[in-house]
Amino acid sequence: RIDFMRAQKIQRDRGKSTSFVPAHMAFLGNPGTGKTEVANLLARILVEKNLLSVGKVIQVPAVSLVSVPPVIPSLFENARGSIIFIDEAYTLLSSPTAISSMVESMDRYKNEVVVIMAGYSEEMNELFHSNPGLMSRIRSQIDFPDYSDDELVQIFELMCLQREYQYDSEMLKLVKQFISIQDKDRYFGNARFVRNLVEEMMLNEGARTVRLCDSEGEDAINDKNLKFFTKDDFEEACVSIQQEIKRSKRLTLGFK
């Protein structure tokens, strides 16, 4: 797809006519499977190849386009040279007007804007089958499968490394056990779940460090216990995560 875009640009630069093949894409999968990260990577590649002039990734929730369809043309105008990333794009199903405006703008800015529509596979397929015009413009559909438990543990390791946090040899076993007992439904969160776990542990470690400093003075803090996750940090984070999961599922089911 990128090679074809490059060939078309060379043809246009040399005054040759080109046959339009849409570069727009659909990223299909559950939350936390890397769709946004891949969109950002794609933007950088397209800029490096001189296929996009700006290379921003403009993230737009589809619900905002459904509620105010007239904003779609101005969205594309402001996104010239960039990628428009539409999250939960299946929400467009509720507004044929928004879909029509989207298709029209995708054609008008076909050489200047790349659209990526993201969402759950089943709902996205329903969206595309509801409008053949939209389907014909989203020629590339890429599946983002859920991460395995081992991959999620590796993501935990990477996130800790990036944030310069350490832990003892038992921590990864505890993390894997906690991940393994989760209900891996579409609301699980994948890498987002791991990020939330790490951030909760960071909050707990920070609070523990301050308590130690207040009770024993700053001299009690050394390089070994600073930015070091303990079992207590992890267990307290697990409690917070489980409570948040319960709240989220109640809201999803329509309870208050």
State each model region's role.
Residues 129-146:
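A short helix-turn-beta junction within AAA+ P-loop NTPase domains corresponding to the substrate/partner-engaging
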Residues 53-80:
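Short glycine-rich substrate-engagement loop in P-loop NTPases that contacts/grips substrate
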Residues 87-89:
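Walker B catalytic acidic pair
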Residues 79-84, 110-118:
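Loop/turn-to-beta-strand initiation segments
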Residues 208-256:
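C-terminal engagement/docking regions of AAA+ P-loop ATPases
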Residues 1-23, 254-256:
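Pre-Walker A (pre-P-loop) alpha-helix and adjacent loop at the N terminus of AAA/AAA+ ATPase modules
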Residues 142, 146-148, 153-220:
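Conserved AAA+ ATPase small/helical "lid" subdomain
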Residues 17-55, 138:
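Walker A/P-loop
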